C-alpha cells in the first residue's frame, strides 16, 4: 500500500492491539519488510499477517532470499603491490607453467618461510585465473584462519569472494552453494569441506598451510558413517579432472609433499626470505627501532620506489627446563620466559604463549634426566590415562603400572605432562597481574563466531597475551606480537604417533613465525626437557632441510 494509505490504516487500527504495532513498523520503515524482520520487531506471526492481508491492510509476496555470510561486511579495497625480486622470480615461473597460452594444469609446492609473501603469490595466481574466465578455490586448514584470509582476498577482489564452512547454518550453506552454482562468486574460501563447492569453471586450487593434519578427516571426528578423505589427495584429483593449477603452500611442507617434489610430481617454488610486513609506508624510524630481529635492505622495490626491507626470522632461545629445576624454579615458566613476558608487556607489545598439546593425551617424564616412559616392546611413548591410573601403549595396547621412580636415574621427580591453557593463563596473572589475557583453544571457540571475535580482540590490542594450542600456530598475521613462548615443547614430541617429530617441528616453526612480523622485531623462547632432540634444534634454527634429512633417515631406519 502507499504511505498515505498506510497512515490512514494506522489511524483506523489505533484501537486494535494486534494490528497497530505492525502498521507502525511498516509505516516507520517506509519500504517492504521481510517477515522475519517484522516478526522480530513486533512478534507478528504468519496467521496474523494473512488476516491483515485479507482486510486489505497489507500485501504479502514470496521472494527468494539468499543468505550471504559476508553480507554487511566491509573490506578495505587494496591494490596489487610491486613484487619483490624473490616474489617476481616465483611468479614468473608459476605463470609460465600454469597460466600462459597452451599450458594445461600444473602442480606446485610453494615453500616459503613465514612472512615471505606467499599470500601475494596466491592473489596473483587468482587474478590470472579470473582473467581466463576461470574460478578459484582457496583451502585453509581451520575456520579460525577464514576471517583474515577473506579480508585479504575480498579486499583485492570485492564482491567476488564467498566462504563455506561448518560454522554457517544449514540454510546459509545451502544458499552459498546455490549462489556458487549460479556463478555469482568466482572465489570460494574455506576448510576442507569447501572442496565440494560447485565451481563450474574451476581453474585454480590453492591449499594454504598444506602440512596441516586438519586437511585429513579422521574417524573420531564424525563417527563411523562418514566418508573419510584427505583434502590434499582429493584436490590433486580434482585439479587433474578440471585441468586446474594446484598450489600447495607452506613454510613447513609435509614430508609426503616434499618427497613428492623430489620425485618430480610437484614443481618446487622457494621463497627463503621474510619480507618485513606492513611495509607500504614503513617509517625509517621504525626500521631502525627493530629490537631483536635484524633488518636487511635489499635492492627490490615497492610501489613507492622505496627499497625492499627484509627481516631475518626471529631468534629462538631454547631453555632446558631440567636446569631450571636444578636452580630451584618449579613453575611452568622459566626465568627467561617470565622476564621476557614482563619486558614485552611493559613495552606495550603483545605476546603469544603456546601449548603444544593435542586433546588430553599426556605422558610421563623424569624432570631430572628427561627420560620418557616407553613401551619396552614397541619403543613407543606410553600415554597416561588418569581414570584407569595406567600407562597404555597405543601401538600394541599393552598396559603398564605408573612408575614411582625414574627407571633411568632413580629420581622420584616424575611429572605428568599435559597442562591446559587455563593453568597458563592463571600463571600469567601471577607474574603480570594487570595483563589482559585471551585463550584460544577448542573450549573457548565452541560457539559460532568466537574465532573471529577472539582474533579481532587481539588484533585491536584489547588483549596483551594470547594463550592457545595449535590454532594460534596457523598462518595468523599479528604485527604487534614480539614474543612467542612455547611452554612445553615436549608434549607433542612424545605422543604415540610416528609423525610426532614432524608435527612438533612444524608447530614450533609455525608458532615462532608469529613473532617479528613488523619492524619491532621479535624473539622466541622454547621450553623443553629434551633440548637435544633434532626436531627442536631444527625448529630453533628455522632449518627445514636439516629436519627433513634427519626425519627421512629416521623413517627409513624404522620401515
Task: Indicate where each model-derived feature is located.
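Inter-lobe coupling/hinge segments of SF2-like helicase ATPases
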Residues: 78-84, 88, 92, 103-559
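Pre-Walker A segment
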Residues: 1-140, 443
Amino acid at each position: 500500500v502507499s504511505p498515505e494509505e498506510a497512515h490512514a490504516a494506522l489511524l483506523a487500527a489505533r484501537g486494535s492491539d494486534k494490528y497497530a504495532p505492525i502498521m507502525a513498523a511498516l509505516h516507520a520503515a517506509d519500504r517492504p519488510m521481510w517477515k522475519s524482520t517484522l516478526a522480530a520487531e513486533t512478534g507478528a506471526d504468519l496467521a496474523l499477517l494473512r488476516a491483515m492481508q485479507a482486510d486489505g491492510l497489507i500485501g504479502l509476496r514470496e521472494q527468494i532470499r539468499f543468505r550471504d555470510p559476508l553480507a554487511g561486511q566491509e573490506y578495505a579495497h587494496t591494490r596489487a603491490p610491486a613484487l619483490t625480486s624473490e616474489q617476481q622470480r616465483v611468479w614468473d615461473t608459476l605463470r609460465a607453467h600454469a597460466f600462459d597460452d597452451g599450458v594445461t594444469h600444473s602442480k606446485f609446492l610453494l615453500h616459503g618461510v613465514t612472512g615471505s609473501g606467499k599470500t601475494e603469490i596466491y592473489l596473483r595466481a587468482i587474478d590470472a585465473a579470473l582473467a581466463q574466465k576461470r574460478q578459484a578455490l582457496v583451502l585453509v586448514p581451520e575456520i579460525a584462519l577464514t576471517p583474515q584470509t577473506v579480508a585479504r582476498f575480498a579486499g583485492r577482489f570485492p564482491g567476488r569472494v564467498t566462504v563455506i564452512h561448518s560454522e554457517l547454518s544449514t540454510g546459509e550453506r545451502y544458499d552459498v552453494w546455490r549462489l556458487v552454482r549460479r556463478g555469482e562468486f568466482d572465489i570460494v574460501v574455506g576448510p576442507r569441506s569447501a572442496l565440494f563447492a560447485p565451481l563450474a569453471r574451476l581453474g585454480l586450487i590453492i591449499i594454504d598451510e598444506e602440512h596441516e593434519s586438519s586437511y585429513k578427516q579422521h574417524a573420531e571426528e564424525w563417527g563411523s558413517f562418514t566418508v573419510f578423505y584427505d583434502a590434499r589427495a582429493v584436490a590433486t584429483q580434482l585439479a587433474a579432472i578440471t585441468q586446474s593449477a594446484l598450489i600447495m603452500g607452506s613454510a613447513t611442507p609435509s614430508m609426503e609433499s616434499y618427497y613428492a617434489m623430489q620425485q618430480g610430481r610437484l614443481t618446487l617454488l622457494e621463497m627463503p626470505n621474510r619480507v618485513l610486513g606492513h611495509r607500504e609506508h614503513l617509517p625509517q624510524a621504525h626500521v631502525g627501532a627493530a629490537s631483536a630481529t635484524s633488518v636487511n635492505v635489499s635492492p627490490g622495490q615497492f610501489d613507492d620506489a622505496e627499497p625492499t626491507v627484509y627481516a631475518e626470522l626471529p631468534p629462538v632461545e631454547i631453555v632446558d627446563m631440567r636446569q631450571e629445576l636444578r636452580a630451584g624454579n618449579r613453575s611452568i615458566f622459566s626465568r627467561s620466559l617470565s622476564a621476557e613476558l614482563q619486558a614485552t608487556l611493559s613495552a606495550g607489545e603483545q605476546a603469544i604463549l603456546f601449548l603444544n598439546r593435542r586433546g588430553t593425551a599426556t605422558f610421563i617424564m623424569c624432570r631430572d634426566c628427561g627420560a620418557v616412559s616407553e613401551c619396552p616392546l614397541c619403543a613407543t611413548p606410553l600415554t597416561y590415562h588418569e581414570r584407569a591410573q595406567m600407562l597404555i601403549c597405543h601401538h600394541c595396547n599393552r598396559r603398564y603400572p605408573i612408575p614411582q621412580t625414574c627407571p633411568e636415574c632413580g629420581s622420584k621427580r616424575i611429572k605428568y605432562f599435559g597442562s591446559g591453557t587455563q593453568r597458563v593463563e592463571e600463571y600469567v596473572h601471577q607474574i603480570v597481574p594487570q595483563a589482559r589475557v585471551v585463550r584460544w583453544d577448542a573450549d573457548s571457540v565452541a560457539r559460532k563466531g568466537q574465532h573471529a571475535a577472539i582474533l579481532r580482540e587481539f588484533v585491536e590490542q584489547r588483549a596483551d597475551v594470547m594463550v592457545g594450542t595449535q590454532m594460534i600456530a596457523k598462518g595468523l598475521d599479528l604485527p604487534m606480537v614480539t614474543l612467542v613462548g612455547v611452554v612445553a615443547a615436549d608434549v607433542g614430541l612424545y605422543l604415540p604417533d610416528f609423525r610426532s617429530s614432524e608435527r612438533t617441528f612444524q608447530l614450533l616453526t609455525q608458532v615462532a613465525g608469529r613473532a617479528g612480523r613488523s619492524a619491532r622485531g621479535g624473539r622466541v623462547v622454547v621450553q623443553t626437557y629434551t633440548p637435544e632432540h633434532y626436531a627442536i634444534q631444527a625448529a630453533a634454527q628455522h632449518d627445514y632441510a636439516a629436519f627433513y634429512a634427519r626425519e627421512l633417515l629416521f623413517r627409513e631406519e624404522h620401515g
